A protein has these predicted regions:
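Hydrophobic alpha-helical membrane-association signature
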Residues: 41-44, 91-94, 124, 197, ...
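Residues at secondary-structure transition points
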Residues: 32, 36, 43, 75, ...
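Terminal peptide-recognition signature
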Residues: 26, 30, 45, 63, ...
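C-terminal alpha-helix plus adjacent terminal tail
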Residues: 1-21, 55-56, 68, 174-180, ...
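Glycine- (often His-adjacent) and acidic-residue-rich active-site loop
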Residues: 4, 57, 65-101, 117, ...
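Catalytic-core regions built around general acid/base machinery
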Residues: 48, 94-106, 112
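Crotonase-fold acyl-CoA enzyme core
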Residues: 103-216, 248
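Conserved CoA-thioester-binding segment of acyl-CoA-metabolizing enzymes
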Residues: 1-64, 100
Length: 252
């Protein structure tokens, strides 16, 4: 993919956005801090997501972290350590709002994960539709070791991805797992050599983008919405979205 940097109407210090034909790459860009998430970084990511929402020429998005050491090493402890209860709740709500907005984006998002995906980093990856990890990737929800709980949706998304029992084990122990175990438990979709990570992510994104975009959007909606309701309502949602395809420009 030939990419170009996008000049947005505000300066971004911590998040980079590149766009190519039908595809975009979003990079959390704080390598000296292992791409840890500050409130400023979350607000910048929110702004980038807004840009992606409004770009109808994009069909798929790749989200990654700068450098090989870390996808995102969690929320920035330097910012969190002095928060009181109310401030911490507001920080958690900010992260959850941004991650939920990413999750609800009308385009598929692929997380390309190298190095650490810890705490908020693991939660960010879980907010994406598909996760591709390098062999060097490491995953954990280690918050209990700091006397807190996952605050950006980890208690909910991890259980939905790997089952309640395994999620409780990982959260209660704070244990770090390697990429191959993450694959075995269903936390990631694919594990590849580090040098092939972005190539694999772009290949999958290109394949997705080669399909009908409205059908992809409706498929995402049907899956995500259906998981939140009972099976009878979920089937109705699928039927409704199936019908919408026949009024779209994509159909046949």
């Amino acid at each position: 993919m030939e990419s170009k940097s996008v000049l947005l109407d505000r300066e971004l210090k911590n998040v980079c956005l590149e766009k190519g034909e039908k595809l975009a790459v979003v990079t959390i860009n704080r390598p000296k801090a292992l791409n840890a998430l500050t409130s400023e970084t979350l607000r910048e990511l929110d702004y980038v997501i807004e840009d992606l929402e409004n770009d109808n020429d994009l069909y798929c998005v790749i989200l990654t972290g700068s450098g090989e050491k870390s996808f995102v090493a969690g929320a920035d402890i330097a910012e969190m350590k002095d928060l009181n209860a109310k401030e911490a709740e507001e920080f958690g709500l900010l992260g959850n709002r941004v991650f939920r907005r990413l999750e609800k984006l009308d385009k598929p998002v692929i997380a390309a994960i190298s190095g650490f995906a810890l705490g908020g980093g693991c939660e960010l990856a879980m907010s994406c539709d598909i996760r591709i990890a390098s062999e060097k990737a490491r995953f954990a929800q280690p918050e209990v070791g700091l006397g807190i709980i996952p605050g950006f949706g980890g208690t909910q998304r991890l259980a939905r991805l790997v089952g309640a029992g395994k999620a409780k084990e990982l959260i209660y122990t704070g244990s770090m797992i390697k990429a191959d175990e993450a694959l075995n438990i269903g936390l990631v979709n694919k594990v590849v050599p580090l040098e092939n990570l972005m190539e694999e992510a772009k290949a999958m994104a290109t394949l997705i983008a080669s399909n009908a975009p409205i059908a992809i959007e409706l498929s995402k909606y049907a899956i995500d919405r259906g998981l939140q309701v009972d099976i009878d309502r979920a089937i109705e949602i699928e039927a409704e979205d199936f019908g919408k395809c026949f009024d779209s420009e994509d159909q046949f």
